[in-house]
Design a protein with these regions (language model features):
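Glycine-rich acetyl-CoA-binding "A-motif" of GNAT/NAT acetyltransferases
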Residues: 69-72, 145
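Conserved beta-strand-loop-alpha-helix junction that forms the acyl-donor binding cleft
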Residues: 111, 137-147, 163-168, 173
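Conserved active-site tyrosine of GNAT-family acetyltransferases
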Residues: 30, 150, 155
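Conserved GNAT acetyl-CoA-binding A-motif
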Residues: 127-139
Length: 185
């Protein structure tokens, strides 16, 4: 169970087996989190499925389970695999000992209940056991609730990039994103 009294959830590591069992629900969670609401962008079901499979194949993750279903999930990869980050500008970040939080998603019905914070904490504790010393996350600068959460959890802004994303299947827009870094203790 979580330490947060607001909502009784448990954690499940996203092992290959657990991921296979939860894949369809994680895909629905991903699509709900990233393609609906105020911060929506267009991502096809096929592309989302491929992305989750790719992250799972090279990274690790954890799900927050509520009533037997994933209410949230966090998936990370080795930071050295994030080709968008201008590593040459940040030689103080040890790329081989840094995890990149590639996806963090919480179902809209349970946002604000401490799930994202708990997922980040649980995931980073697991990563520290593997010798990871740093963590980085990237977020759309306009997603103020997420930016505030990450900063509250000790992440500090280190870089900005602009990415072209899809608003619809054919219409694009420019999304300014920020990278935030945290030294793990």
């Amino acid at each position: 169970m979580s330490n947060n009294p607001k909502i009784p959830f448990s954690f499940k590591k996203l092992t290959s087996r657990n991921y296979s069992v939860l894949k369809d629900e994680l895909l629905e969670l991903y699509l709900q989190a990233f393609t609906t609401g105020e911060y929506a962008q267009y991502v096809s079901r096929k592309d989302a499925s491929w992305k989750l499979d790719e992250i799972q194949s090279i990274g690790s993750g954890v799900a927050a389970m509520l009533h037997g279903k994933p209410a949230g999930a966090l998936m990370g990869i080795p930071f050295a695999l994030d080709t968008d980050f201008p590593a040459e500008n940040h030689p103080h970040i040890p790329m081989e000992k840094t995890v990149y939080i590639a996806e963090l998603m919480v179902h809209e019905d349970v946002r604000g209940q401490g799930i994202a914070s708990a997922l980040i904490h649980e995931f980073l504790e697991n990563e520290k056991e593997k010798g990871i010393t740093d963590a980085v996350i990237r977020v759309w600068i306009e997603n103020i609730p997420a930016v505030k959460l990450y900063e509250k959890l000790g992440f500090r802004r280190i870089e900005e990039i602009t990415q072209t994303k899809f608003k619809s299947e054919t219409e694009t827009f420019e999304m300014k994103k920020i990278y935030l870094h945290k030294k793990l203790k």
